[in-house]
């Protein structure tokens, strides 16, 4: 129906989360109508991000440096580590302005049915951070769904005798993702976290 170039663009756009065929067509048509330099700037920004952005060597967040801005910030409370599944969760929690500790990004959640086991996540790195640093509390902020709860329980079992282990309070919808929660809900969940 359309040229192979348009069909390829639509196919690539549908690979993005939440983008179906109709939205992909709208985005493709918008990009084609836009001035050429705007489309090329978008392509350049995407290429730059893919080439420069990597994972922080300490926490697993996204960064262009060896360590991320949060890990380098001397004003952060280094006695508390908030464990999240993905770097996008760090951004969601930072928007609340309620948390001033450090983070640890697991890179996913335990899901044996999908082949995601403890060794596939950054759990060993978390255990080493807790042993090596002066950490007194670990806040488990995995998603409030089946895999997130299983991951939180698994980590809590390994940390319970070493540090205080807390979980975000209720208020987050079960089955939801942190990335899509609003700042007020996340702020309340952080403030009302509980011991496991």
Task: Identify the function of each model-found stretch.
Residues 56-59, 68-71:
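Short cysteine-rich clusters marking metal-coordination/redox-active sites
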Residues 63-65, 76:
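Short functional micro-motifs and their immediate structural scaffolds
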Residues 24, 72-142:
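Extended interfacial segments that mediate partner engagement and assembly in macromolecular machines
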Residues 49-52, 64:
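Short metal-coordination and nucleic-acid-contact micro-motifs, chiefly zinc-binding Cys/His arrays
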Residues 1-17:
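Extended, structured, electrostatic nucleic-acid-contact surfaces
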Residues 2, 99-100, 127-196:
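Long C-terminal interaction/binding lobes of large macromolecular proteins
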